[in-house]
Amino acid sequence: MARLFTPSESKYYLMALDAGTGSIRAVIFDLEGNQIAVGQAEWRHLAVPDVPGSMEFDLNKNWQLACECMRQALHNAGIAPEYIAAVSACSMREGIVLYNNEGTPIWACANVDARAAREVSELKELHNNTFENEVYRATGQTLALSAIPRLLWLAHHRSDIYRQASTITMISDWLAYMLSGELAVDPSNAGTTGLLDLTIRDWKPALLDMAGLRADILSPVKETGTLLGVVSSQAAELCGLKVGTPVVVGGGDVQLGCLGLGVVRPAQTAVLGGTFWQQVVNLAAPVTDPEMNVRVNPHVIPGMVQAESISFFTGLTMRWFRDAFCAEEKLIAERLGIDTYTLLEEMASRVPPGSWGVMPIFSDRMRFKTWYHAAPSFINLSIDPDKCNKATLFRALEENAAIVSACNLQQIADFSTIHPSSLVFAGGGSKGKLWSQILADVSGLPVNIPVVKEATALGCAIAAGVGAGIFSSMAETGERLVRWERTHTPDPEKHELYQDSRDKWQAVYQDQLGLVDHGLTTSLWKAPGL
């Protein structure tokens, strides 16, 4: 791509808008991938009274917050708006926005919106109970998180909005639209609607036809890193960017995070350790899981897809344990000037591998078609305080997260035949050196830890740079900009021990699911429609 301008390498910057589930960030990077400044604000999604599971996205308030973050980032960086070479946006997947025929956004929901449980059940019965299988084979998605049941819910309960709807996009595309006035979606994020064909990386309107829904609301599809438009005068006045700044198509947070980690070639594998843990494996061509346990999403790299298996609430479980049981450790850590998790890891490092047989029951491996979990619990506790204490439970949680990751990676290998030679571990979890080593020991693979552990915004900035003509290739730039902090090598003896722990945990977990099935305990989480 020809350059849109000829920047001095030390003078120009890239801005990424990162719209997560709980916050919006505007992050400024230099052209070597160094983070220069950030503006951040939390946002809250709106539960609609008398609509169980609803979680609407506040379009007006959240656009104001996005603009404030852009102004804050520019202020914190101390740079003039004309030195922002381009801007792009990424967001949580599954969140959707609807627009009327005048281009006004009229309704949106966050990724966690679960109002359409009844519609999921209805849709599963279509085509002699084969509709969900057809959706999955074409798109890599099941109905639980897709846009189809949400649109059907609107048709049933908010026909005023459904009739007005002229276009659908994802939240990242909405941010780009608010900046530029141009509507389009990218495959990586739109792929999570359950409406985008994995093979052709374009919409499959027949799926909406089969569901009895309108197929005339699908917006143009443009690849990540494509120039979409420029910042309008109206947007510039609100957000502080210069009129005419290039606005580039962004994408889904996980896929752009992989770009920022240099995970851009077939068979490369990442474990992204946040609130949820995503185990992601790059596949050279679209293929889906015959068992429907794993989701498959378009990568931001054209032609490539990612098999993704998700561990539920892994980071949230660790936060719960810290906040519920470790008040003393929080005070000690504060006095020492260290993070509480660092102190807990130091304590846990003195517990032997296997954590004296304690088995946490929280997330199961992903079972995308029938996705639910057992009730949270600890199994096989001892009343010996030397063996069963906070340090033991904390180590057991870290070991269990790694075991669930290994199970998720195994089920990807089962259908893809890809067995990775190493892992990239990123996100908040990778800050823990003990946790990183446990992941290496459980998986039996070398685990590489990047310097930039929250790489989503960096991947988004790379896309902005490609769209502006600064970088020639997303994949090559991702590989060039990633830097490594450390590598953890697996211990063969501990790996063998953890194999035994994994087998026992899987057997116990199945029994715990049976308690949920019989109504005796309450699932940690259950997908809509189950």
Swiss-Prot record:
It comes from the Bacteria. GO terms for molecular function: autoinducer-2 kinase activity. It is an enzyme of class 2 (transferase). The keyword NAD does not apply. Keywords: Cytoplasm, Kinase, Transferase. Its main location: cytoplasm. It catalyses: (S)-4,5-dihydroxypentane-2,3-dione + ATP = (2S)-2-hydroxy-3,4-dioxopentyl phosphate + ADP + H(+). One of its GO terms (cellular component) is cytoplasm. Its EC number is 2.7.1.189. It holds the Pfam family FGGY_C. It is found in: Cytoplasm. The keyword Amino-acid biosynthesis does not apply. GO terms for biological process: carbohydrate metabolic process; quorum sensing. Catalyzes the phosphorylation of autoinducer-2 (AI-2) to phospho-AI-2, which subsequently inactivates the transcriptional regulator LsrR and leads to the transcription of the lsr operon. Phosphorylates the ring-open form of (S)-4,5-dihydroxypentane-2,3-dione (DPD), which is the precursor to all AI-2 signaling molecules, at the C5 position. Belongs to the FGGY kinase family. PANTHER family: AUTOINDUCER-2 KINASE (PTHR43095:SF1), SUGAR KINASE (PTHR43095). This is Autoinducer-2 kinase.
